């Protein structure tokens, strides 16, 4: 398999920004549209994810028009009723199968954690390549972060 440093590997990965939650702990609304340092949290996530993948989509629930100015493919959960982040992962997989069947991997980035590493996708890709695994998730401080994953 090609190492992530190879541009072909990056081009064959679709990034899925996960923004489909209810934001219950923050009183509802779109967490990713909150401002942080003069940009939305979503824009911070877009800025970090874009150079790591060949294509980037935004997974949401609700009215897609509120995200239209981001110029991303916007995909609503295939499973209704705010089923959780795995519904966004599944939706991303379905979108890739339909729109980019040549891509073998998706990398998921939750939009409520915008300061993920700039080499996250490459580390995840290398983990699945080195271990001949079917998926990998991020870990730090002895804890797993499964929403940051390659699938």
Please provide the spans of the model-predicted regions.
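N-terminal amphipathic/basic-hydrophobic helices that include classical n-h-c signal peptides
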Residues: 1-7
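Nucleotide and nucleotide-moiety/phosphate-recognizing core
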Residues: 9-150
